[in-house]
Every structure is written in structure tokens, then in C-alpha cells.
Regions:
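Bulky hydrophobic segments
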Residues: 1-142
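N-terminal hydrophobic or amphipathic helices/low-complexity stretches enriched
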Residues: 141-193, 359-361, 365-366
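Second-shell loop/turn segments in exported
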Residues: 145-147, 163-173, 201-203, 254-256, ...
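Noncatalytic luminal/extracellular "stalk/propeptide" segments of secretory-pathway proteins
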Residues: 166-281
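Soluble metallo-hydrolase cores and metallopeptidase-like ectodomains found primarily
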Residues: 243-247, 255, 260, 307-389, ...
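Short helix-loop-beta-strand segments that form the rim/entrance of peptidase-like active sites
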Residues: 404-431, 559
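His/Asp/Glu-rich mid-to-C-terminal helical/loop segments that flank catalytic regions of hydrolases
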Residues: 405, 522-565
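Metal-dependent peptidase/peptidase-like ectodomains
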Residues: 423-520
């Protein structure tokens, strides 16, 4: 049976429509392909290309029918494409999917369809068709970007969270590697440095774990070569203040919970020999309630092992006298002997840095808006285990760089200056941001608002804004922008908290928000915080919300003055 060509084109048209609906209305986190894929990010080129294919197939379908002229078919197809594009935007708005009714996308749809439909007219009306085509091509050149480059953002996260960055900590120059990469990105964007080579140096004390990290529980006085060692990062980690030990061997001494309630038990423990003190995280949290003499005796133990429900690493500026490990409770199997080796090195005055760049304002360059994110993480634990830190905070750095790319474009040059601050040593206790506040590269009274970006790789459940209950008027403005554009499912205000780099600025009187997304991956300060775990479901929304909020504070491009006046 012979199938006519126009039926084939009709089938292909309907198939393409089904594919478009699937891609535009499927939540990003449920798609089998990463949402960083350009087609799913729906930037201008993607929209135009998708609708160009739709218009071409539709025109061939209608043109194959009897009585349909090429011009009439082109007109019907163009109107249908505009209507279909509008329908998609309405559905995205109602279903809270995709980019939530970015109507600039409809312009891209029309441009793509229009360019393809002009092709059949080139032979008969070449000059007119070329003129219209040139006009359509010129339209996007003056349009401001409406979304981040999600593919580029995901690549940024993947680079920063890669093994080559050594966890962006203080073993094997991890944070210096990350800083070198970010200097290159700032330079490529054409941002002006706020310090030589974008770098503000400072130093800190930090406890590190660069070498051996071994733990084994068995009944033999020797390490058992055929019995697997517990895996660092997966089954145990070093406590941040752990001291070193080489090939230690001791018996476990599980802490009796009666020491917290029975004075006789507490007194008996003051005279008991303690090998490896084994206690739960709940017991450890209550140690300060014990008699001082018993606390001192427990501190003299050969080693500490704390059983925890989840491994959550952190950093410290001090070092205990003995090794202290945190072991996943579900992986702990008590035996008669414990073998351990911990290479711990306390680095004094370790040299590190903040990075600082600026886009100078066109109207009020001495007034500043600040976008900040910390680029450091927890580094390594042993010679092989590293903490990727994809969500914390490669995601925030990626969003900062996307906003920097936006404001670096000449057509988006802000009225106020916009500073981009990449802080080091946040995980060590807000060291980098505190140093900046004490040694500011821009006058703190000239900062109109600071937006700190941290933990922005998810977003299925919206975002929380720390200090939203402090700066209520600014939070209402943020909420109004989010409601108008449906950037994120919801925004939640929170009070002040010393949980990221906004805090030293807030304490110094600088208005500041710290925004982080919720939902999705629960990995935090562990080896599972990897790029593949991040949906980036709220990344584009957080970008749009941050951009619009900063524009409202003074980052919106200044109006071009009429030279005739």
C-alpha cells in the first residue's frame, strides 16, 4: 500500500508536537536526561530551533494537500505555531513546570517558525524575504538573557566537585586549585578585579587528614589482611579535631549510660582504665553534664569512637591529644580489639584567599550590590577519600558565575556597581568572609544589599531566605517577584543565623539575605554530595529571582540618555 507524502509529514508533525509537550511539561527532576541539556533549558536558540522544525513539518503537510498555496499554508502554520507556543506557556504557568511562562520564549518560537516559513518565498520575493529575515534575526540581539546557561552551570559544578579539586580543602592544595580555576573564569568574563589578580590573601589554622586513615575491629592483636578495613568517608570519618595515631591497638570501652544518672557509676568510671572510649552521639552531647573529674578522665582515653546515625564531616582549628573517629552506627560491629591509624596534621597559618571582582555601575559606581558564595569545602580524609561539595557550594558558585555573565554583558551593565565575592574558609568557621568584613575591599556603608548564595543545587520544595524576618520589606519584595514569575514553588522567611557568609556582613550592619533551595538530595558534608545527585530543579528560578531582586535594588541597567538633549 502506497502512503502519500503529506500523510507522512502529518504523522511526523503530530509526533513532534507530542515530543515537545513531553519535554516542556515533564518536571526536570523526573526526566531521564539531565535538565542541563540545552533543549530542556529552552534558551532562545533552543526555542527557535524546536519551532523551526515544527513549522517546516507543518508547512510540508499542508502544502501537500490539494488547493493549498504555499503562502496560505505558511500563514496558517505561523498562526498555529504562535497559538501552540502560547498554549505551552499557559500550561507551564498552570502546572508550575519548565520556566513558568517566560513570554520572551514565545518571541523565540515565532522567530524560529518565521525564518523557516520564509524559505519558500526566497525564489519569488527574495529581497523582501531577506529583509524580513534580517529583522527577525536582529530581534534577539537586543533581548536580555532570560535564563542561565544550565549546561555551563552544570559543567562548573562538575569541575569544582571533581577529584582534581581534592575537595577544595587544605590537603594537596585543593582550595588553591579551585581558586586558580575561578580566577580564570572571572578573567574570561571580563570582570574587573577588586584586588590584584582578584585575590585577597589571608591565613587560618586548620586540622587536616592528608595520609593514612584506617580502622578495623576484630579479635586479633594484628591487622587482618583478609578482613576488610572500614571505608573512610563511607563507614567512618575523623572528628574535626582528631589527633594523630600510628598503628594503635586497644580494647573498646563502651560508655555506660548510668554515669549520667547514678553517682556511684560515675565515681567508678573515674578510676576505670579506658582504652578506646566508645559512645553514642547522644551521650557525647551530654558529656558536659558529668562531673569535671570524670570529664577529665574520659579526655585521657587512648582514643574516641562516637557512633553516629549519619556521617557529617566538618573542620576545626584545634587538635585533640588522641584520635577521635565518628563511625556509622549501622556499620559498627564490636569486637575485643580495635586497630586504628590516623594521619592528622594541624596546619598553622595556612595561606588561602578570597576572590573579588566587580562590574562597575554606569550611573552610581560608588554604590554596591554584592553577590557572594563560598568556593571552599572539606577537602580530603586520607589519601583517596574526598568530599565533592557539589551542592555545598559548587552550586552557589555556579549561580554566582551565571549572574556575573549576565551583568558583564554591555546591554546589562548595571546602574549600581555589582561586586562578586568568592569566599574561602567558610567551612572552617566563616573565616574568609569575616576577614573581608575586617579588611573590606569596598566600603561597607556603600553596600546597599548583599545576596549570599549557598546550597542551590535542588529546589523541588522552593527556597529559604535567612534574614527574611529581619528585612521584612525586602522579603516582601522578593516574594512579590516570585509570585509574579513563579520562579520557585515557595519562599520561606527565616530569622538571623550564623550559618553562611552573610552573617559577618549582617553583624556589621550590611543588609543581607542568604538564600538556599530545599528538597531533592539530602547529601550534606559527606562523600555523597556529588554533581549527579543534584536536580538543579530550582536553579533557573533562583537565577531569575536573584537577578530581578538585584535589579530592583539598583542593578537594573540605567536608561540610555538621549544625546540630542
Amino acid at each position: 500500500m502506497k502512503i502519500s507524502a503529506h500523510r507522512v509529514y502529518g504523522f511526523l508533525t503530530l509526533l513532534w508536537i507530542a515530543i515537545m509537550l513531553l519535554l516542556t511539561l515533564t518536571p526536570a527532576q523526573e526526566m531521564p536526561i539531565t535538565p542541563a541539556w540545552k533543549l530542556v533549558s529552552f534558551d532562545t536558540a533552543a526555542h527557535a530551533g524546536v519551532f523551526a522544525v515544527l513549522a517546516g513539518l507543518s508547512w510540508l503537510w499542508l502544502r501537500g494537500r490539494r488547493g493549498q498555496s504555499g503562502g496560505r499554508a505558511a500563514g496558517l502554520v505561523l498562526l498555529s505555531c504562535v497559538a501552540f507556543g502560547a498554549l505551552i506557556e499557559v500550561l507551564q504557568y498552570v502546572m508550575h513546570q519548565g520556566r513558568h511562562a517566560e513570554w520572551s520564549d514565545l518571541l523565540s518560537d515565532t522567530i524560529g517558525a518565521g525564518l523557516v516559513l520564509l524559505l519558500p518565498l526566497l525564489k519569488r520575493q527574495q529581497p523582501a524575504a531577506l529583509a524580513v529575515g534580517a529583522l527577525l534575526l536582529a530581534l534577539p540581539l537586543h533581548a536580555q538573557p532570560t535564563a542561565p546557561d544550565l549546561a555551563r552551570a552544570r559543567r562548573t559544578i562538575e569541575v569544582l566537585a571533581s577529584p582534581a579539586m581534592r575537595g577544595r580543602g587544605y590537603v594537596q592544595q585543593g582550595e588553591h586549585r579551585a581558586a586558580a580555576y575561578l580566577r580564570g573564569r572571572l578573567h574570561k568574563l571580563g570582570l574587573q578585579p577588586l584586588a590584584p589578580d582578584y585575590t585577597q590573601p589571608f591565613a587560618l589554622d586548620v586540622n587536616t587528614f592528608p595520609g593514612k586513615m584506617k580502622l578495623q575491629s576484630n579479635n586479633s592483636p594484628l591487622f587482618q589482611p583478609f578482613q576488610p578495613l572500614m571505608q573512610p568517608g563511607v563507614e567512618f570519618i575523623a572528628a574535626p579535631n582528631s589527633g594523630p595515631m600510628r598503628n594503635g591497638l586497644a580494647k573498646p570501652s563502651p560508655l555506660d549510660s548510668l554515669v549520667f544518672f547514678n553517682p556511684d557509676t560515675a565515681r567508678a568510671w573515674q578510676h576505670r582504665h579506658i582504652g578506646v572510649l566508645v559512645l553514642t552521639s547522644r551521650q557525647q552531647a551530654r558529656l558536659s553534664k558529668l562531673p569535671a573529674l570524670l570529664q577529665q578522665h574520659l579526655d585521657s582515653a587512648f582514643a574516641w569512637i562516637t557512633l553516629v546515625p549519619k556521617l557529617t564531616a566538618s573542620l576545626a582549628a584545634t587538635q585533640a591529644r588522641q584520635p577521635r573517629l565518628e563511625v556509622l552506627a549501622s556499620s559498627w560491629h564490636p569486637n575485643n580489639l580495635i586497630h586504628l591509624s590516623v594521619d592528622a596534621q594541624l596546619r598553622r597559618a595556612y595561606p588561602t584567599q578570597n576572590l573579588a571582582a566587580v562590574v562597575r555601575g554606569s550611573a552610581q559606581p560608588d554604590s554596591f550590590l554584592v553577590i557572594s558564595a563560598h568556593y571552599d569545602h572539606l577537602g580530603m580524609m586520607g589519601s583517596k577519600t574526598y568530599f565533592p561539595g557539589a551542592n555545598d557550594n559548587a552550586s552557589g558558585v555556579a549561580l554566582l558565575l551565571e549572574l556575573a555573565a549576565h551583568y558583564a554583558r554591555p546591554e546589562n551593565r548595571p546602574a549600581y556597581s555589582v561586586a562578586f565575592l568568592l569566599f574561602g574558609a567558610e567551612e572552617a568557621g566563616l573565616v574568609g568572609s569575616s576577614y573581608f568584613v575586617q579588611h573590606p575591599l569596598v566600603p561597607l556603608p556603600r553596600i546597599k544589599f548583599l545576596l549570599n548564595l549557598d546550597l542551590l543545587g535542588t529546589g523541588e520544595e522552593g527556597a529559604t531566605v535567612v534574614n527574611g524576618r529581619v528585612y521584612e520589606a525586602a522579603f516582601r519584595q522578593l516574594t512579590a517577584l516570585n509570585d509574579a514569575h513563579r520562579y520557585l514553588p515557595r519562599l520561606t522567611a527565616r530569622g538571623p543565623a550564623a550559618n553562611s557568609d552573610h552573617f559577618p556582613f549582617s553583624e556589621a550592619g550590611v543588609p543581607a539575605f542568604f538564600m538556599y533551595t530545599r528538597g531533592g538530595s539530602l547529601a550534606y558534608h559527606d562523600v555523597n554530595d556529588r554533581p549527579a545527585a543534584l536536580s538543579l530543579a530550582g536553579f533557573a528560578g533562583a537565577y531569575g529571582l536573584a537577578r530581578d531582586f538585584l535589579d530592583a535594588q539598583g542593578a537594573r541597567p540605567a536608561p540610555i540618555k538621549n544625546p540630542s538633549r
